[in-house]
Amino acid sequence: MKECVPVKTFESLFAELTERAATRPEGSGTVAALDAGVHAQGKKVIEEAGEVWIAAEYQSDEQLAEEISQLLYWTQVLMVGRGLTLEDVYRHL
């Protein structure tokens, strides 16, 4: 596996999403996702989880990694939408 420098880490993504929720920049897809509510966010989590499974079964590692990144994004959007912190989740790991 080749080494790469991450553009974002799990923690930095969460910080970015939390900041966008607070500052609500115009035209932000994250703000739109948060405004759509927990039901819509949950549907995206389920959709992305299914795409992760399909990618794991039938697609390349690169495609799988991309699908996992989208699942992590939508999971964090849902967390922010519900007011959870990383620490709330880390307590259960």
UniProtKB/Swiss-Prot annotation:
The organism's place on the tree of life at top rank: Bacteria
EC number(s) per entry: 3.6.1.31
Gene Ontology biological-process annotations: L-histidine biosynthetic process
Pathway(s) the chain acts in: Amino-acid biosynthesis; L-histidine biosynthesis; L-histidine from 5-phospho-alpha-D-ribose 1-diphosphate: step 2/9
Gene Ontology terms for molecular function: ATP binding; phosphoribosyl-ATP diphosphatase activity
GO cellular component labels: cytoplasm
UniProt keyword annotation of Cytoplasm present: yes
Catalyzed reactions per annotation: 1-(5-phospho-beta-D-ribosyl)-ATP + H2O = 1-(5-phospho-beta-D-ribosyl)-5'-AMP + diphosphate + H(+)
Xref: Pfam families: PRA-PH (PF01503)
CDD domains assigned: NTP-PPase_HisE (cd11547)
UniProt key word ATP-binding: yes
Location in the cell: Cytoplasm
Keyword entries, A-Z: Amino-acid biosynthesis, ATP-binding, Cytoplasm, Histidine biosynthesis, Hydrolase, Nucleotide-binding
Similarity field: Belongs to the PRA-PH family.
Protein name (Swiss-Prot/TrEMBL): Phosphoribosyl-ATP pyrophosphatase
Provenance organism: Rhodococcus erythropolis (strain PR4 / NBRC 100887)
